[in-house]
C-alpha cells in the first residue's frame, strides 16, 4: 500500500480490512492517529537514541555533536507527542572518540533490527507487554532538531573540541561547513569531513580567534580554545580530498 495521503479514506479503509494486529514504524514521518491507533495491539516505533534523550529528527547526529560517549536505540509505543511514548526495550552502543555519524548509523541499524525483533517477540509472548513511561526515567528529555544550514556551520568562537564533535556528528552527511579565505582571495565554502584537535594552542595577538594557519601540509584554524586542524575537506563542486592535497593545488596556481 502506498497512498498519496495517509489520511486518505480508501487507504484507511483498506487497513481496516486487513485487521492488523501490530503496527511498526521505522524511519518514517509522523503517522495520523487514525492510522497508528488502528492495529489491535497498537503501533510501536524504533528510534535511534536512548529516549528520553534526543527526541526528534536527527538523534544520531546530535548525540555525537554533543560529545556523548554512548547512544543506542529505543522501541516504544506510539502516541500523539513526538517520541514520548512508553518505552518497551532499549539497547546501548558506545561511541568511540573518533567515531562519526556514518559509522554509528550503520552500527545502530543492525542493533535496531535486533531490538525490533526482540520487541515483536514480547508481543508474541504477551499481547500487553510491560512498557515504562518516559516520565519514570530520571533523565531530562533533550531534543534532536532537524539539521539546517545554520546549525551545521562551524563557528570559530567555540572550543576546538566542540567543533571536532560537530564535524564527527555530521560526517559524511550532511557535513559541517565553513567559509575560508586564502591570501586575500575570494572566500571559499567547504564541507569539513575530518578534523583533529590541538588543544594547547590559545588565541594570541599573533594568532587571533578565527585566523587560518597554514603549514606545509596542514590547515588549522585558531578557535576560542585550541586549534582545529582540517584533515579532509570538500570544496564546493568538487570531491572530498585531504587538506594536504588541497593546499598543494592551491600553491600550484
PLM region descriptions:
Residues 1-172, 186, 235-237, 242, ...:
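One-carbon transfer enzymes
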Residues 151, 156-253:
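An anion-binding loop in the catalytic cleft
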Amino acid at each position: 500500500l502506498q497512498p498519496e495521503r495517509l489520511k486518505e479514506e480508501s487507504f484507511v479503509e483498506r487497513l481496516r480490512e486487513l485487521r492488523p494486529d501490530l503496527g511498526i514504524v521505522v524511519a518514517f514521518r509522523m503517522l495520523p492517529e487514525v492510522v497508528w491507533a488502528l492495529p489491535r495491539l497498537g503501533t510501536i516505533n524504533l528510534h535511534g537514541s536512548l529516549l528520553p534523550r534526543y527526541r526528534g529528527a536527527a538523534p544520531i547526529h546530535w548525540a555525537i555533536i554533543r560529545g556523548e560517549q554512548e547512544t543506542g536505540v529505543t522501541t516504544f509505543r506510539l502516541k500523539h507527542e513526538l517520541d514520548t511514548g512508553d518505552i518497551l526495550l532499549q539497547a546501548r552502543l558506545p561511541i568511540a572518540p573518533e567515531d562519526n555519524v556514518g559509522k554509528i548509523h550503520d552500527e545502530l541499524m543492525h542493533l535496531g533490527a535486533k531490538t525490533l525483533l526482540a520487541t515483536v517477540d514480547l508481543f508474541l509472548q504477551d499481547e500487553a507487554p510491560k512498557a515504562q513511561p518516559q516520565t519514570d526515567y530520571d533523565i531530562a528529555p533533550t531534543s534532536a532538531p532537524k539539521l539546517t544550514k545554520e546549525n551545521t556551520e562551524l563557528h570559530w568562537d567555540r572550543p576546538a573540541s566542540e567543533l571536532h564533535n560537530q564535524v564527527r556528528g555530521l560526517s559524511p552527511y550532511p557535513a559541517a561547513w565553513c567559509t575560508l579565505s586564502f591570501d586575500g582571495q575570494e572566500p571559499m565554502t567547504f564541507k569539513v569531513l575530518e578534523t583533529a584537535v590541538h588543544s594547547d594552542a590559545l588565541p594570541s595577538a599573533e594568532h587571533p580567534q578565527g585566523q587560518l594557519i597554514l603549514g606545509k601540509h596542514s590547515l588549522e584554524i585558531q578557535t576560542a580554545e585550541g586549534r582545529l586542524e582540517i584533515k579532509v575537506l570538500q570544496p564546493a563542486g568538487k570531491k572530498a580530498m585531504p587538506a594536504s592535497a588541497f593546499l598543494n593545488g592551491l600553491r600550484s596556481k
